[in-house]
Amino acid sequence: MGPTISVITPASRGVRELSNLLNDFKNQTFKNFEHIIVYDGPPPVDVINLMKTAGPWTQFCNIEKDYGNMDISPGTKPRNHGIKISRGQYLVFCDDDDRYKDTYLETLISNCRDNMIGIVQMSCQQSRMYKDGDPETIVLVPEIDIHMFPIICHVGTPCYIVKREWAIEEPWRHEPEHDFRFIKRICEKFKPMIQIVGGMQVDVDGLVLKGMKDWVSFPPFYRE
């Protein structure tokens, strides 16, 4: 039997960021997961050496960089490769430059069941959406009314957990692509219920650790 969760990280950064990433997932309170790190292009020697020290739940691989789609969908190829080789019932997508609370996976999986996906909060402006794609109309997510979620336009990469079977049927695309388009297609096609859980679990760019943010919840903002 495979793991409950497959965590997929499209990686392109160096040892410092990846060391933090490995440590954050080593400390997760939820243990039934695999962590697939897909390096975009040939990894440096120091990254290869670091990955040799990773825990047995970590699978490291690299793919040929997709230069033809770098401008419009730089993360599509590594994410889809991760989906293809994953074994988990659920998928979580994590960036390699963020920090993750030890309760991150436990919080995401806590309310997942048949037709439901979980959403958690991030620590900065990347956890907001743009109404109709317009950056002048900003609404913070994912603290948004549960019944309004399918109409939102932006969700940050590590905010959500989805069924693997959904991502296989509706993978990332080679077109102007972002997390909000991927998750919006999932919502439109499979019409899952959304459970917003656990408050803030993701520290974007390490702002909390740098003392620039606190682990607090944003006040709710809703789309008009």
Regions found by a protein language model. Give the residues of each.
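Cell-envelope/extracellular polymer assembly enzymes that use nucleotide-activated donors
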Residues: 3-6, 24, 34, 181
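Short, well-formed alpha-helical segments that are part of the catalytic scaffolds
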Residues: 14-27
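Acidic donor-binding segment of Leloir-type glycosyltransferases
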Residues: 24-68
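Glycine-rich, basic loop-to-helix element that forms the pyrophosphate-binding segment
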Residues: 66-86
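Short aromatic/hydrophobic "clamp" motif used to bind/position activated sugar donors
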Residues: 91
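The conserved acidic donor/metal-binding loop of glycosyltransferases
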Residues: 95-99
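Conserved donor NDP-sugar-binding/catalytic core segment of glycosyltransferases
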Residues: 105-136
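Conserved nucleotide-sugar donor-binding catalytic segment
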Residues: 145-224
